[in-house]
Amino acid sequence: MKFIIKLFPEITIKSQSVRLRFIKILTGNIRNVLKHYDETLAVVRHWDNIEVRAKDENQRLAIRDALTRIPGIHHILEVEDVPFTDMHDIFEKALVQYRDQLEGKTFCVRVKRRGKHDFSSIDVERYVGGGLNQHIESARVKLTNPEVTVHLEVEDDRLLLIKGRYEGIGGFPIGTQEDVLSLISGGFDSGVSSYMLMRRGCRVHYCFFNLGGAAHEIGVRQVAHYLWNRFGSSHRVRFVAINFEPVVGEILEKIDDGQMGVILKRMMVRAASKVAERYGVQALVTGEALGQVSSQTLTNLRLIDNVSDTLILRPLISYDKEHIINLARQIGTEDFARTMPEYCGVISKSPTVKAVKSKIEAEEEKFDFSILDKVVEEANNVDIREIAQQTEQEVVEVETVNGFGPNDVILDIRSIDEQEDKPLKVEGIDVVSLPFYKLSTKFGDLDQNRTWLLWCERGVMSRLQALYLREQGFNNVKVYRL
C-alpha cells in the first residue's frame, strides 16, 4: 500500500532552506509515529510531498488514521501505483478502479501530470472522462460540484489511482518551533490550548498543579497521555506534577478573600517559570480566555504576567466557551473534561475582577515563599511514555488477567466511537459497555456481586481507571488483557 502525504500550504511558501528543514523534520516525525505499526515501512521525502509505503495490509487503517493526526500534514492520498503505456491504458485502469463508485452518480475527472508525455492533463481528463461516461450508462459527467471526483496523477510512466483522500490536521511539524510548557488542569481550555501549540509545531510538555489528591492527578495524566499519544507521540515530552495543596493552604490561611484567585495564578506562573527555566523551555501555555472568569480580565492577566519574565502564550484568549468545547469535542478531550473536577474556582467567594498591584503585593508579603520553593523542588517529573509503566507499578494490587471465571464480566471502557468501530466480542463471557468517562458516576450502579474486568485496547486507561476505582473502595475490579 502507498500513501502520498501533501504538505500544509504554509510550509510550501517558506524559503527553500526552511522548507527543506520542515520537510525533513516531518519525515522523521512520520517515521517515529508509524514504526509502532510497521517497522519495515518506507518514508521517502520529495520537494512537494512525502511517500509512505508499507507491506502489512492489516495495518492500513491504523496507518491512515495515524497520518491524519500528525501536525504538518494537509491531507493524505491513499493510492494504487501502477505502470501505464498510453491514455487508453489509463482509461482502462480507471474504469476498473472507479466503476462501482460511479454507478448512478455524477462525476468529473481531474488529472495532475509530471514528466514528459505526448498528451496534456486536460487531454487525459477528456479521454478518461468520455470513456467512463460511455462505459457506465448510469453515470453522468458534471464538471461543477459532481458527486464523485475521479483523481488521477501521472508521473513519468506511473499512474497513481487515488483510492481516497483524507484530511490531516495541518499546522507545522512538531520540532520546527521551540518547546513550551502547558499548564494543564484536565479541563476544556488547557487541553485545547495544548493541542493548538502542538499543531503549530511546538513540542508541548505538561505542568500539573495538583489541588485534589491522587484521583485528580490520575485524571489529568489521562488527558496529557491522550493528547501526546494522539497528536505528539513523535517526540518525548515531560509530565511535571507539583503538589500545590500546601500553597493553597497558605493562601487560604493568610490571604484576603478577594485577592486569592489572582495570587493563586501568580504562584502557579512563578512555579511553572521555575520548571521551564530548569528544563530550558521557552514559554508557558495557558487556556485562559479573556473575561471567562474573574482572574482572566485584562487587569488581572497583566498582574499575573508581571511575576515572571517567561513568555506566556494564550491561544484561546479571544475564544468563547462554546467554541472551545467544540474544539475539545473534535480532538477527543471533551469527555475527559466533563468529568474532571475543578478546584481553582472554589477557593475565593468574592474574587476581584480588577486587582490593584499594591494590594496584591501587600497580601503576598504575608505568604511564606519557602513553601512555593519546596513544592517546586519536590515536583515529580516523568517521561510521559512512562505513565503507563508507572501506572502498572501503582496498581500492583489490581490483578491483571487474560482469563475469566463464571462470575466475571468484561467492562469495555473505550469511548463509544471506538466501541462502534471495533466491537469487542469474547466467547464465553458477557461484555458490558461503560465508557471511561462515566465510570466515576455509573460504576456503583453495576452489580457489585460480580467481578468486573476492565478492558481498553492498549491497557493504559484500564489500569488508570482500576486505580481510581480502588481508591473509591471498589475491590471487585481487575484489568483484562486479551
UniProtKB/Swiss-Prot annotation:
Residues 404-482 form the Rhodanese domain. NCBIfam families: ThiI_C_thiazole, tRNA uracil 4-sulfurtransferase ThiI. It comes from the Bacteria. Keywords: ATP-binding, Cytoplasm, Disulfide bond, Nucleotide-binding, Redox-active center, RNA-binding, Thiamine biosynthesis, Transferase, tRNA-binding. Pathway: Cofactor biosynthesis; thiamine diphosphate biosynthesis. ATP binds at L183, I184, K265, G287, Q296. Pfam families: ThiI, ThiI_fer, THUMP. Belongs to the ThiI family. It catalyses: [ThiI sulfur-carrier protein]-S-sulfanyl-L-cysteine + a uridine in tRNA + 2 reduced [2Fe-2S]-[ferredoxin] + ATP + H(+) = [ThiI sulfur-carrier protein]-L-cysteine + a 4-thiouridine in tRNA + 2 oxidized [2Fe-2S]-[ferredoxin] + AMP + diphosphate; [ThiS sulfur-carrier protein]-C-terminal Gly-Gly-AMP + S-sulfanyl-L-cysteinyl-[cysteine desulfurase] + AH2 = [ThiS sulfur-carrier protein]-C-terminal-Gly-aminoethanethioate + L-cysteinyl-[cysteine desulfurase] + A + AMP + 2 H(+). This is tRNA sulfurtransferase. InterPro entries: Rhodanese-like_dom (IPR001763), Rhodanese-like_dom_sf (IPR036873), Rossmann-like_a/b/a_fold (IPR014729), ThiI_AANH (IPR020536), ThiI_fer (IPR054173), ThiI_N (IPR049961), THII_Thiazole_biosynth_dom (IPR026340), THUMP_dom (IPR004114). Disulfide bonds join C344-C456. GO terms for molecular function: ATP binding; CCA tRNA nucleotidyltransferase activity; tRNA binding; tRNA-uracil-4 sulfurtransferase activity.
